[in-house]
């Protein structure tokens, strides 16, 4: 591998159990979404989310928007206004102590070591930037946000699109060939590699195909940076 100046991390299946969102975060948001909208509808941030959701979903009243959002959640669709609203709901949960994020035991030591060597660390996830900050700010290993230089979500583009990785490289001001991307999803790694990034396939909760085209690790202490 070439030297790296930045490491970009996926969340689910990479730093965090792949089912953390589906078994903990999504049910928490789904149960609370209707009441959250009713209680906070007058707040500018929630009003803007509802306006965006109406445009995306093609519906025009709050009740229909809530139904559409629940439908998006059931289908695990990466719709930006839904992700933003989920983040607000999770924020309440983390602040109240209802939620604590899972990270694998090898993650925090590796992040601290890389950060200590001057490597910049970023998160790229389909979850909103707010949700990402909450996940890493309230982990079983403590607050990891001081180690992170920035966050990217679907507003920069979807994770299987080459252009997303080019935009991230431009945004952080690092040459693509000196950026390392860690993910458990081959299609994301393929897109990052096509953008000129270095890639490592993190194999934790599911096995890659036999024709894996990327270097593989099972733990972060195996990452050669």
Listing of model-derived features with the role each one plays in the protein:
Residues 57-105:
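Metal-dependent phosphoesterase signature
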Residues 15-19, 130-133, 190, 208-209:
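Short catalytic/ligand-binding loop motif for oxyanion handling, primarily in non-cytosolic enzymes
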Residues 121-167, 171:
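Extended hydrophobic/aromatic segments used for targeting, binding, or gating
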């Amino acid at each position: 591998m070439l030297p790296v100046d930045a490491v970009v991390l996926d969340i689910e299946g990479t730093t965090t159990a792949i089912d953390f969102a589906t078994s903990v975060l999504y049910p928490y948001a789904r149960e609370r979404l209707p009441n959250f909208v009713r209680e906070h509808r007058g707040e500018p941030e929630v009003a803007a989310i509802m306006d965006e959701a109406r445009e995306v979903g093609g519906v025009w009243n709050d009740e229909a928007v809530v139904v559409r959002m629940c439908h998006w959640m059931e289908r695990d669709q990466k719709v930006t206004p839904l992700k933003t609203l989920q983040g607000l709901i999770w924020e309440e949960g983390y602040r109240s102590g209802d939620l604590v994020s899972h990270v694998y035991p090898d993650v925090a030591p590796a992040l601290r070591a890389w950060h200590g060597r001057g490597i910049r660390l970023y998160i790229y996830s389909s979850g909103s930037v707010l949700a990402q900050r909450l996940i890493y700010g309230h982990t079983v290993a403590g607050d990891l946000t001081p180690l992170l230089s920035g966050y990217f979500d679907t507003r920069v583009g979807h994770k299987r699109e080459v252009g997303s990785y080019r935009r991230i490289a431009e945004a952080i001001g690092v040459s693509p060939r000196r950026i390392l991307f860690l993910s458990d999803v081959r299609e994301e790694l393929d897109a990052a590699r096509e953008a000129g990034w270095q890639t490592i396939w993190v194999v934790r909760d599911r096995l890659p195909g036999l024709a894996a085209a990327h270097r593989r690790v099972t733990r972060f202490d195996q990452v050669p940076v």
